[in-house]
C-alpha cells in the first residue's frame, strides 16, 4: 500500500508573482499572486500563447482579464471560483488587486516556450481603461 506522501502532493505559493507548482506530461498548474506587471499603474503589455489555451480561476482578491478579438478589447471582472478559458492565439492580460491569487492551468512550460509579449497600443489601453470595474479605479490604499 502506498504512503500518503506518494499519493498526495500539497503545494503553496505565498510569494510575489507567477510560480508553476504541479507538472504533468502535457500540462501544468501555477499560482499567480500580485506582481508589478498586473498593477494598473503598469498597464503596458499583452501576451498570447499559440499552442495552448490558458485557464484562470480567481480564488482571492480581485482581478479583471482583458482579451482582444480583432479591433475590440473586452475586459471581464473575474468572479471567485469561476473558470475562465482564454483560447490559444488570443491576446490577453490581467489587472489585479494587491491581494490577488489566481490558479492558472496551461500546457507545460508555456511561460518558457510559448509566450509572445508586445506593448499594448494606445487604442487598446483606452478600451481597457474605459471598462475598468469600480474596484480598479479606486486609490491603491483602498485596493489592498
Feature roles, as predicted:
Residues 32-50:
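Conserved short histidine dyad/triad with adjacent acidic residue
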Residues 39, 61-67, 83-84:
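Short beta-strand segments in beta-sandwich/barrel cores
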Residues 70-88:
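Short acidic-glycine-tyrosine-enriched beta hairpin
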Residues 65-66, 86, 91-97, 104:
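Short beta-strand His + acidic residue motifs that chelate non-heme Fe in jelly-roll/DSBH
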Residues 49-65:
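Short, conserved beta-strand element in jelly-roll/cupin
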Residues 1-31, 38-39, 141-144:
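A short, N-terminal "cap"/entry segment at the start of jelly-roll beta-barrel domains
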Residues 95-144:
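Double-stranded beta-helix
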Residues 26-29, 52-55, 81, 99-101:
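Short, surface-exposed beta-edge/turn micro-motifs
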Amino acid at each position: 500500500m502506498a504512503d500518503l506522501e506518494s499519493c498526495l502532493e500539497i503545494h503553496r505559493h505565498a510569494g510575489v508573482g507567477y510560480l508553476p507548482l504541479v507538472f504533468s506530461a502535457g500540462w501544468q498548474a501555477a499560482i499567480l499572486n500580485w506582481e508589478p506587471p498586473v498593477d494598473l499603474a503598469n498597464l503596458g503589455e499583452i501576451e498570447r500563447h499559440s499552442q495552448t489555451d490558458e485557464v484562470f480561476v480567481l480564488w482571492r482578491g480581485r482581478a479583471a482579464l482583458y482579451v482582444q478579438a480583432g479591433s475590440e478589447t473586452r475586459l471581464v471582472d473575474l468572479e471567485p471560483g469561476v473558470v475562465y478559458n482564454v483560447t490559444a492565439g488570443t491576446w490577453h492580460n490581467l489587472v489585479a488587486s494587491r491581494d490577488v491569487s489566481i490558479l492558472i492551468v496551461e500546457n507545460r512550460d508555456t511561460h518558457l516556450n510559448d509566450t509572445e509579449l508586445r506593448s499594448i497600443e494606445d487604442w487598446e489601453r483606452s478600451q481597457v481603461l474605459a471598462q475598468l470595474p469600480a474596484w480598479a479605479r479606486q486609490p491603491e490604499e483602498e485596493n489592498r
